[in-house]
């Protein structure tokens, strides 16, 4: 009986020790969204370059901020400001592909920061925004599993 209990306990613990894969669009230094301030997309409505001396790390990504206030806002609620789909092009993810981004082609949809490959791709994404967003959300776990680390 003790052996069965020990075996069940060990088997139940295995998922606890399994590492979760991540898939992040980072530069060689581990910086997300090309060093732009993620909070500024929401507060200013445009890309604003962050400063390396004002940085925070969250979920394996380093973010730069243009002000201490933006850094504080991010630190208090990082999930609100970090880009979805690891910072990859949302339209690409909707097509089950990873694509780089043009920082000027960002958009905020349902309170989430989406990055796009280009403004033209953003326009294509928006032609069927709800459907493309649903496809991207459905494809993302598979991309993380197959291409993540």
Pin down the residues of each PLM region:
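Charged, low-complexity intrinsically disordered segments
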Residues: 19-149
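C-terminal segment of classical bacterial N-terminal signal peptides
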Residues: 14-18
